[in-house]
A protein has these predicted regions:
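A short beta-strand-loop structural module common to alpha/beta enzyme folds
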Residues: 2-9
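Cysteine-nucleophile active-site neighborhood
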Residues: 24-97
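Acyltransferase
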Residues: 154-187
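Beta-strand-turn-beta hairpins that frame and shape the catalytic cleft
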Residues: 115, 150-155
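Structural motif
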Residues: 19-21, 156
Length: 187
């Protein structure tokens, strides 16, 4: 597999799959995507059902809006991003390990595996408008926060697979195997 750091929309033509990572804040990230000309290309990528994986802020950018800023999101997934509730027994930012609670079929989480523990660092969580887009949650106080979403060939995780040790590597391995097998839509 060949990896490429794509900073120009013209480079997308040569890609079979795309990872949208993100660290930082919603508005500056969206402004960077706008200034690089990537916004319409990312929307088209999803519309054409090409494989896309968002990570951390990359998950949040897929949604229509965020309480963290005023710039509209990509709108690839319907819903919004809101700050984690302050009234919980949890600290914000939510930092640490949490066990995924699968909600829907997703290529990253085979049914045969025990739900993994993964590492989170975030203060905001996505609220998908369509329940079918919610692939997994994680406990946050007495409630649950979105941990993974999946729609067609677009998926994303709020946690950091690269900081999640073997579990994170296994999730990325499942995504690569899914790509190699033809990126079939989840059943």
């Amino acid at each position: 597999h060949q990896l490429e750091d794509v900073r120009d929309p013209g480079c997308l033509d040569h890609c079979d799959a795309l990872i949208l990572p993100g660290v930082g804040s919603f508005d500056p990230a969206m402004e960077k995507l706008h200034s690089s000309g990537m916004v319409e290309h990312l929307r088209s990528w999803h519309h054409n059902e090409r494989p896309l994986l968002g990570i951390c802020l990359g998950l949040q950018l897929l949604f229509e809006s965020s309480e963290e800023g005023h710039t509209p999101g990509l709108g690839i997934l319907k819903g919004h991003v809101q700050r984690l509730p302050e009234d919980q027994c949890e600290r914000i930012p939510h930092m640490g390990w949490g066990q995924l609670r699968p909600q829907q079929p997703c290529p990253l989480l085979p049914d045969s595996e025990t739900a993994p523990w993964v590492y989170f660092v975030h203060s905001y969580a996505a609220i998908p408008s369509k329940p079918s887009d919610l692939a997994a949650t994680v406990a946050f106080g007495q409630d649950a926060a979105t941990a993974m979403v999946w729609n067609k060939r677009t998926g994303a995780c709020q946690f950091h697979p690269e900081k999640s040790a073997e579990a994170g590597a296994r999730l990325l391995h499942h995504w690569i195997r899914w790509l190699e097998s033809g990126a079939e839509l989840p059943q």
